[in-house]
Structure formats: structure tokens, C-alpha cells
Amino acid sequence: MTTPARSRGRCVTLLAPLLFALATAAEAQWVATGALATVPVIRDCTETGGDVAVSRLDPPTVYLCPHVVALVRKKDPGAEHFYFVHEFGHIALNTADEAAADCWAARELAQARNGSRYLAAAIAHFRHRPADSSPRYGTPNQRAERIQTCAEDAAR
């Protein structure tokens, strides 16, 4: 026999994940819209090769590595969201150019409600990284400066 207390317990158990998902979605600052909203996001660390996220242009797809996302979030909460938006920049611009995707993501976040939180986290994240240079990204400090400049330009 099911008692009212047991029924309420089951209801809470079933509704809790849904309420958590809705609360998480409400906190998200940037959401893909238009054609970008149809881009699949797949959680697959094999596809990311150990990176936070990567994108493919044909077909347009974003891959996330939940393990690396969690590591970035633990160290620099919010910076992981910049990586996510950055990958959509590649798809929106149909380019492999990392600087262009950085700038696109910075402009998008600068216009998003409370996007400055994610921008500040990403800028701090890159400023704290070792000064190793990459031909695709430049140094982490150059990347931080690029993100900041693009965000400031978008805010004008």
C-alpha cells in the first residue's frame, strides 16, 4: 500500500532532477540560437583529444569532454563556458581560425545577460596559465588580451 508520504517522496525524487535541470538552464548566460541551436553537442572525451571542447565544421558539431570541463570549472569557475561558446564561433563563422572564434565568443558573451562573469573567468583563466606559445592561439596572455579587447569593442 502506498501512503501519501511515500507518494510525495516519489514525486520529489522524480521532480528533483527536472527542477535542477530547469534551474541550471535558467542560470546559463549564452544559449545557441537560430541555426546554431540545431548543432549537436556531444559529450565525448575521445573526440576532444583531451581538450575542453572541439568543433567540427562538416557536419557542424560541438564535442565536450565532461572530465576536462569539470577540471576547468573547479580551478576557474565559468571559464569552461567560454570554451563552449568559442566552439560555436568556429561553426558560426565557418572557420578554423582560433583568434576569430575567440573574438566571436567574446562578442557574444559581452552581449549576453551576465556574460561578463564568464568573460572575467576566461580572462583570468588564460592569465594564470603558463606562458607557452601556440601558433594557433598565441600565448595565454595574448589570448586573454584578445578576449578582453573583443568584449570591450562589442560593449561600445
Task: Go through each PLM region and give its residues.
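Positively charged, aromatic-enriched nucleic acid-contacting surfaces
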Residues: 78
